[in-house]
Amino acid sequence: MNFMNSVVRETPARRQLPLPEGTISYLEWGYDEPGKTPLHFAHANGFNAMTYRRVLAPLADQFHVRAWDARGHGATTLTADPGNHRNWYVYRDDLIAMAEDFVKATGRKIILAGHSMGGAASVMAAAARPDLVRGLVLVDPVMIPSGARHVMLLSQLFGLKGNPLADGAEKRRAVFPDRETMVERYAGRGAFRTWPREFVEDYVQGGTKIRDDGQAELLCAPAWEAANFRAQGHNITKSVRNLHVPFAMLYAEHGSTCRPPFPMLLKRRDPKAQVTQIRGATHFLPMEFPKLVADEIRAFRDRLEAEGR
């Protein structure tokens, strides 16, 4: 059976988690049968839960899956002020709130999985609250060595830009005549050049709203996406060193955001972990190798079961 054609068999439910300052919107699969393994997936900066539908939907036979729209993304309504954004601890705290609700609903610790920024947030949440987390599956998480991070912080402190990713995001066009035009503009180009068209369509579907004038507008404001790239005041090294849960990691051969020494540091935290560089993959590994990512999540769950965790 063709993987890309078989993954749409289950339509996710759209849910809301109310918090004091707004709601976290998330998608949910596999919730109709008790006993499935609880799994939360956190997306990359600028994306949304629906982007990963073709990775996550096939897991619904064995997993109870929740995938959020992070603060400032998708249908989530939590405050997202680019001018006051300094680090990713806000995502850690939001993810802890999601994990607490998921654990309460299922009565079980959950697996946290995430891509890029979502992987980093999952590491920080697991380090802070191992009582909620059974393990981690990381897909090219953003882990920047301290020297490079300090340069970013100094640039931010003195009002300098000097961050090509942030500068590019800030210039991103936010409004198109319709979603179809947006898909045509993105497909096969720029950051989307290695994505199957179906992933671009899902990204646009989950990441836009239709305005009163009929035009399609990005739900993740370019200014917020840019602020995320610049907001490097969190200490991911400290979180890695405080990890006390098992994990697995896939990272890219080309343009990986998981820079040395982090693959080695992570391996020290869990000597049994599978830390695998995927040949031919870029940072957009989930879009390029969706079945591989889904299979890694299944294999990690099997490892936990075999070890009685």
Positions of predicted regions on the chain:
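Conserved alpha/beta-hydrolase catalytic His-Asp/Glu region
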Residues: E170-R230
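Conserved serine/cysteine hydrolase catalytic core
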Residues: G207-R268, Q277
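A catalytic-pocket lid/entrance helix-loop region that shapes and gates access to the active site
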Residues: V139-V175
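The conserved beta1-alpha1 loop
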Residues: H40-A44, H115, Y251
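Conserved HGGG/HGGXW glycine-rich cap/lid loop of the alpha/beta-hydrolase fold
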Residues: S25-A80
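Conserved hydrolase catalytic core segment
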Residues: R108-V151
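Catalytic histidine-centered segment of alpha/beta-hydrolase-like enzymes
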Residues: A281-P290, A294
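Active-site loop/oxyanion-hole signature of alpha/beta-hydrolase fold enzymes
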Residues: L19, R66, A70-A113, D295
